[in-house]
């Protein structure tokens, strides 16, 4: 006799265990974790990464989240929001730290301390892939073969040093193509900024001696270099070579000027970054001063995101300042040269581990120290004062910014102060090299890391069709936004869009945004006054009569700043595109003329114009140029 299944038995296959959340989920995960170093990620309901952490023992660290003994409510909130966890084991704890740093920068978790506006720094490179090494500014990955020196805190700092090096060591700064095409010295030789190796006015060995002196100076041997030059000047004077002595005198003066301009030149610090943290009112500022070759190469202030960051459940003795400085240093040096010495006002948590990780990255010992007395302590105190002042300025600006955004909301009848404002402008010359620019602003001011430029691609636009250009820019921008939102990516949706122009530009913007289904975003046209007078701007809002703001209104000044910044950015992008277009060499358009033949032709005739004037008979004399290619080149310059 066959048993008849009960109702409860029939329902059993349909019944599923409730998904685990929060502490229960973490407790379940712990049972499968190894007692090994690694990185863990806490995942939220929308598959967003809430937190990234590292551990010497994944099992021992993660179990603490399930035990309920939380240092602050922030950890409790993070645990409650966790619906999944992911783990990566590593060979050592130092490897885990490096991976944690990389993932935090990549994923930007809500509960981690996060370094914002982390831009690369300019450096100086002495190229080593040419008989006459070139001195130049560089930013980004070290793709050029040569010796790199930096970082410099700003373009101004690196340009000042380059200017000094040119005066003192007379090294070339021109590109290889310009160098190879010279048959007489350029203006830099005339003003004593280059020794003209391109034309043989200085021998190879003598030029290399200048390169060696420049390298020694950049490596911190400035006193030895200046002493050598002073001795050479005295010898020249004794031998009555007064012109050579005067040149050496000018070079020494140029080097001396650097020490005076950098203001802070410590005697006991050759190579170090000095880092100071100040925390106040739920905000933080980290000032970094760069010292290389015994000189101050500039400084920069950072304002890491610390609101919402979770504390370390493993060690309640770790202070907030220690957590912030540890996270900052890790993220800051993730993609930057690490100095041999880092001086700080706060001892990082796990300082020895951080030093070990930095040593792995840099291939040499890295010391992190908190000096208590002497010149180094004075340096740290000076940097801390700068951090405190910078945070004070930012907090004052933030308070004023909040009022301005509230005023913008009132002026344009928005439901709330805008968190993200996007401003658009175009720049071109009669339609040529047209570029659209987008700048972004919000409660923290201009968000320059989110600026975007749009090279106008349409070939159907009438030259100078500003409406058509604006449509293309907005279509590309908001089509991308729609795609990001559909795919669940971290999309940046603006609360307010400002377009430079009146009713026509506003209508163009509304048309595109309606087509893309983003017409819930507020759009305003900003038209300049008669004769482009500031203060007479008119504002265009859909369904409303154009209006003006009070001439001395702070909100009007703010909107003018936004418009001017968009204009500046668009013009800069246009000039860059136009400059690149002008630099295009017509030889690049000729089939069969590659880099080698191009170089040979320029060397033989000095310039593309010289090539264009050459006869077929002259062209075939150049190495690698056949009769057929010579005729093709000759015909190219004479077509039309």
UniProtKB/Swiss-Prot annotation:
Task: List where in the cell it is found.
Answer: Cytoplasm
**Keyword Lipid metabolism found:** no
| GO BP terms, alphabetized | nucleotide-excision repair; SOS response
Major place of residence? cytoplasm
**GO MF term set:** DNA binding; excinuclease ABC activity
What range(s) does the UVR domain occupy? 223-258
Q: Which UniProt keywords apply?
A: Cytoplasm, DNA damage, DNA excision, DNA repair, Excision nuclease, SOS response
Which residue ranges does the record assign to the GIY-YIG domain? 35-113
Name the GO cellular-component terms: cytoplasm; excinuclease repair complex
Instruction: State the protein's purpose.
Output: The UvrABC repair system catalyzes the recognition and processing of DNA lesions. UvrC both incises the 5' and 3' sides of the lesion. The N-terminal half is responsible for the 3' incision and the C-terminal half is responsible for the 5' incision.
Instruction: Enumerate the NCBIfam families for this protein.
Output: PRK00558.1-5 (NF001824), uvrC (TIGR00194)
Would you identify the family this protein belongs to, as annotated? Belongs to the UvrC family.
Report quaternary structure and partners.
Interacts with UvrB in an incision complex.
Protein name, entry field: UvrABC system protein C
Q: Which organism is it from?
A: Caulobacter vibrioides (strain ATCC 19089 / CIP 103742 / CB 15)
